[in-house]
């Protein structure tokens, strides 16, 4: 066995947790690598960012060396570059050392030929002859934007079923963000299609407090598991929001377990349900990867008392008016150059840190006002701030959290102007 060496501790790779659900013979690492948040570098010439391939290779090498074998990507991740980057990194390893998952992300074009081309491009980008886990990406919208329009009316589901039969897709499933009606409809097709897995957003906040049109994770999990379908978990940390939490909630978690990270609570919650096959984490930095390996080497399942403790924590978090942005960047690029996730992430950070001036009578007003405005300018260049939103709405259909993005940008911009004019 290869020893797993982590900063400040040492554990054996044999202790890591795997899941297996017959008749599927795959032995899948409970920690899966989400490839939506690969590290980036400033692009030559200063126009945006490019993926840091050298660092991606280092992260993938470390992950595989330490037992991670499930890698999840999509044609739309990192503005279209994730699949290629993931393929470059994985190609350097034996094919039997990893399972790769990708998706049909045909949000903007439901044409049959477009979907087939996207599928074949994924094989090419990933440099593989078959895809282990293939998903109908982000079901949940009604009508033409959902299952019916994107996969049934155009014959694409029939095409994918034939690809599964031919062995070029080993397991076929779908990921979900949306309405209960669309979820129930997709799941009801299991008897005729035989879904091999379903990917849902599951964390201790969304268990009973899903935002927007999304469905509570307790319902999603119970329904999928009742049909004996393995569950792949996405957003166990809500795009990092469950590690960037208000100070008193942070203290609440640390007091309960001083040795563990705040993130480890979320990963234990996501990994405890027995029908979970793997838990995806978009690990941009090595310390994220090492911390998550520590949590799942092996997983210590939550006790009933700990589970209730986290659900109570989620109740407390509902008092904080953050925008439910997970920094997925599906809304990007904005045609007017706005850094949409940058604006929303900064706003949420200030809410959680208490740097949200309420009025000039607040004793912390001056300090909080300065922290918000200076931090905003440092986080988001002026030409990319919310003030440039014209409300075109191009971003809205792409948001898996159903955020009314122009509305939130205009609200934040109005708040910023009030702070600048000191009219709160």
Where does each model-flagged region fall?
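Structured C-terminal cap/extension of enzyme domains
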Residues: 69, 194, 219-424
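Conserved, mostly hydrophobic/aromatic
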Residues: 21, 33, 63, 71, ...
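Catalytic domains of carbohydrate-active enzymes, especially glycoside hydrolases
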Residues: 56-76
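Glycine-rich, proline-tolerant flexible connector loops at the mouths of alpha/beta enzymes
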Residues: 42-45, 50, 70-89, 140-145
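Short catalytic-loop micro-motif centered on adjacent basic/acidic residues
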Residues: 70-77, 170-175, 278-280, 399
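N-terminal amphipathic alpha-helix/helix-capping segment at the start of soluble metabolic enzymes
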Residues: 14-34
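Single conserved hydrophobic/aromatic residue that forms the stacking wall/gate
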Residues: 1-13
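Glycine/proline-rich, positively charged
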Residues: 41-42, 109-232, 237, 245-250, ...
